[in-house]
């Protein structure tokens, strides 16, 4: 395990807001190809479409990976429930739950677009992982 990972009592020091995020931390900790990782260490400014203001987005993870080819690749990773990665179903448009889901999706999409631009500018990759990837 790489010293740069900051391991040991890692789960006391790292931020995770879901068990899925914790599961990803354990994966990072046990994967010898992951040379560095951190939780909510990167700050990406984005303009929120719901209020028009600039906010700060803290993606869930940063990782540095040694690919099979030997190339080093950096990733910014967001862990999200799959249902939050696509627009809500239009059939529910009149409900308060639909309105909340639509606002959440619009805000998330703005964050992810900003993250994609941030990563492209820095030769990094942006990934959204869902339960399909973690289980």
Describe the role of every protein-language-model region.
Residues 1-7, 11:
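Single conserved hydrophobic/aromatic residue that forms the stacking wall/gate
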Residues 12-15, 101-102:
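Active-site rim elements
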Residues 15-16, 38-74:
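Active-site metal-binding core of divalent-cation-utilizing nuclease and nuclease-like domains
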Residues 17, 21, 25:
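Nuclease catalytic cores
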Residues 20, 36-37, 112:
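Tryptophan-centric aromatic hotspots in well-structured domains and transmembrane helices
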Residues 28, 59-63, 73-81, 115:
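Conserved catalytic cores of phosphodiester-cleaving nucleases, focusing on short active-site segments
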Residues 29-38:
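Short secondary-structure junctions
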Residues 79-135:
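Catalytic cores of nucleic-acid endonucleases
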């Amino acid at each position: 395990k790489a010293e740069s990972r900051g391991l040991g009592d890692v789960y006391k020091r790292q931020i995770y807001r879901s068990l899925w995020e914790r599961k990803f931390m354990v994966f990072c900790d046990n994967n010898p190809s992951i040379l560095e990782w951190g939780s909510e260490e990167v700050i990406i400014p984005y303009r929120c479409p719901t209020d028009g203001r600039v906010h700060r987005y803290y993606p869930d993870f940063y990782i540095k990976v040694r690919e099979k080819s030997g190339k080093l690749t950096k990733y910014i990773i967001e862990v999200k429930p799959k249902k939050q990665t696509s627009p809500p179903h239009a059939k529910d448009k009149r409900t308060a739950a639909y309105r909340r889901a639509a606002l959440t999706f619009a805000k998330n999409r703005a964050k992810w677009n900003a993250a994609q631009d941030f990563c492209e500018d820095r030769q990094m990759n942006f990934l959204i992982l869902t339960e399909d990837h973690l289980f």
